Amino acid sequence: MIEKLTIKRSRQKVIAYSVIIIWLMIVNIWLLNNYHLNSSTLTRHGNGDNLIDEDDDSSSSSEYSIYNELDTENYLGQQHQEEDVPNSQSTDNSLIKPTSPAKNSFKDDITIKILQKHLQKQQNNPKDIRTKDSHAEIYNQIFENHPQIDTILGNLNFNQRCQLFFQNLFIKDNNWILNVKDKKIKLENKNDFKFNDFKKSHLNEFKRQFKTMKKLLEPNKIIHNKDFDNSIEFQDFIKMKYEQFWNRTMTYEQKIVDSISILRIFNKCYLIEEATSTTTTKNNKQDFIKDQFKLVDGIRRASKKNPSLPKFKPTKQEQMVNFDNENLSPSILEHRVYPWLSFEYPVYERWTGKVQYQPPKMANYVKDGNQKTTKKTKYNNDKYLSSFFLNRLKQKCNGRGLVLSISDLHVDVTVRLIHLLRALNNRYPIQIVYYDNLSKETKEKIVTAAREVMSHVPKSFERVAKYFPDDYLDNDQGGLPKQEIWFINTYNVIHADYKLQFRGFANKFLATLFNSFDEFILLDADTVLTQSPSYFFNLPQYLETGTFFYKDRTTYETRPKSDSIFFEKLGPSVIDSVMFNIPIMTSYTLNRSFFKGLFHYMESGLVVLNRDMHYSSFLTMVQMNFFEPVNSRIHGDKEIFWLAMAINGKQNYYFDENYAAAVGVMTPDIERTKPDKTLHESKELCSPHPGHISHDDNSLVWLNSGFFYCGQNDKVKFVEEFKHKSRLKHLNTLEAFKTFYYSPLRIENAIIPPMDLDIWAANNEDEPAKGWFGDPRYCSGYMWCAYDKIGGKTKSGKNTRLEGKIINFDEQAQDLFNYYGDVWVGME
């Protein structure tokens, strides 16, 4: 009996303890949700949470002034900021000037290190291989004011972090703006970063300066260069000059880091969240914050810190900058970050002459079902997000199409491209994007090429007719399919103060941003497609990543290491990653040949892009193009496309694995014998056209420089080129030579040369030492010869042989190339 009572009482105790434990867990969960996760009673403003605690009496503006010296706490805090952060009110509306780093770097904080490791693991990036981590200077101010980093990372939700970042920009300078016209930001000489290079490059200049200085100090003394060449005083003078150069350069680079960081964080905070190929209904920002709160709580409990998370308390100055619609609407930030925008839409003009002032709905004009694209990201009736012009622009874009950026100078090749697109049975609309003006004559030529009856095709069609659908030549509809043409005038989208900033290559980025498609293929006017546009839209890698890029020739032009370091610095910092979930650069980007020293990496004559997945990167492209130190390190626009994505924290871009090939007809072996009259092991193909070969099946998908054998005929000096007679030996007369240049390129073969930046394939067998050789004697300098093998035995017996790839196109492919070439050139 006693045993039964004991067992019964034990069970009762277990039940009671269990109830108490469950009750305590519920209380803790309630506290976590209502205390730790919400550090104060917050007032909702649109889509952001105000950092001001309305229950905190100290937040009442009537109780104190930030200028009241008798308020000891406030006065000392302000004094501390003024001492540590100089030039707090900039007078030139430019970005914050670099300040000295905090004495105790916040990057060394254990919480930040653990959170970053966790993020890298989630992103399948176990090792950080970067050599530089450069953050926006404003973080120094934020973490000096809030040295207990856990109060930010363990308390503030995503919107509150955004507010905190931009509040501090206003505290630093109420007139801050991303000044893209700052001409002081420049690259003095990218090859001078090492002291010895700098000294060698400027030695004579410094001798003159030093001599002038000495004459001013000692006017009666005759000074010769030999008197001071090796003097300590002169060496110190050079070191001083180098230090000045270095400090100027670091200042300019930090301004660019600040500008790109602010842009990146604004886009992350206030633009509609971008889709991925595997978009779910999860709110990524909320998931990121919830996960981080749990980790911060776990870190505090596991460490010697007080497990109770301190409450976040904004500084008095932060409380003065209140983001609400009546005081400081966050949409004002859009004007500060994008001062070059007029916040108007482009002018959209259909081929009929009808004009629209907002993006057209393409499904109303092209009714084949290809224009009914579904938005993966939506406003969800959020008036806050819709207050931003850039969000409205993104949401109004729709459908799929082709985009060209041209001027009147490009009308001839544009007409030829449109003829080719008709031959390729293209059904996608085409938008011609221009800046400022496109003449009436140019528009007439383009519309005529797109809409005229085109039922007569070259004789070469007979050999390929079987490869096209039965309705390919539908005479009732005007033969080859007519094209839906739109002209997009982007001049009015640029603020009047910045119109001169958009010339040349910048137009391509305007075309990227302001065409009206969700998905598009951006083309150069002289690009030649050998596959239909639908081929590119259906590439699996494009569907997965929202991009498809192609590589350039591997011409062994190199860049200094300082270039790679510079672009690394522009990427997201660790604190960007931890605060805003913007991933740092990984080996996916940093192991590319560009970062190892290759100068030409991407070819941008054909780019496939998805706006819904990469919109913020489009904006980063435009911003990067403003900076002279960026443009001085690349050729034209091409590298900015993929670099902008990596710098924006978006590394879901894709390159075809093949580098560009030379396409055409291989040089007969007998025409390039060795000095002893024996044949080379290597094969040679000389062509003015780089072509792009699919890694998947070795098919030719597109090529550059039009379809004339030589795309530079207006510049060619035919008499001089014909006299060389070292190539094209089958052409016996000047007239035949000239006719050949104006004929379509005939494509039978392609060569993708080998490439290894670490190997110069010198050899003793008269084989080429590098994969590409530019021959300036032909096609006005546009002739390049490619070799499938380079290197061989050296005098020491070493073998430097590297092998590339030869592609021999079958009869069907050659017949199609001939037909497309005849259409492009206009042959009967």
Swiss-Prot record:
Record bears the keyword Cell membrane: no
GO MF terms, alphabetically ordered: alpha-1,3-mannosyltransferase activity
Top-level taxon of origin: Eukaryota
Pathway the protein acts in: Protein modification; protein glycosylation
Pfam families, A to Z: Mannosyl_trans3 (PF11051)
Location(s), subcellular: Golgi apparatus membrane
EC number(s) recorded for this UniProt protein: 2.4.1.-
Keyword match Transport: no
Lumenal side: 35-828
Residue ranges with Polar residues bias: 86-103
This protein's GO CC annotations: Golgi apparatus; Golgi membrane
Ranges in the topological domain labelled Cytoplasmic: 1-13
Gene3D superfamilies in UniProt: Spore Coat Polysaccharide Biosynthesis Protein SpsA, Chain A (3.90.550.10)
Region ranges (Disordered): 80-104
Glycosylated residues, chain numbering: 38, 247, 437, 591
Similarity-based family: Belongs to the MNN1/MNT family.
Function noted in UniProt: Responsible for addition of the terminal mannose residues to the outer chain of core N-linked polysaccharides and to O-linked mannotriose. Implicated in late Golgi modifications.
Record-given protein name: Putative alpha-1,3-mannosyltransferase MNN12
Organism expressing this protein natively: Candida albicans (strain SC5314 / ATCC MYA-2876) (Yeast)
Gene transcribed to yield this protein: MNN12
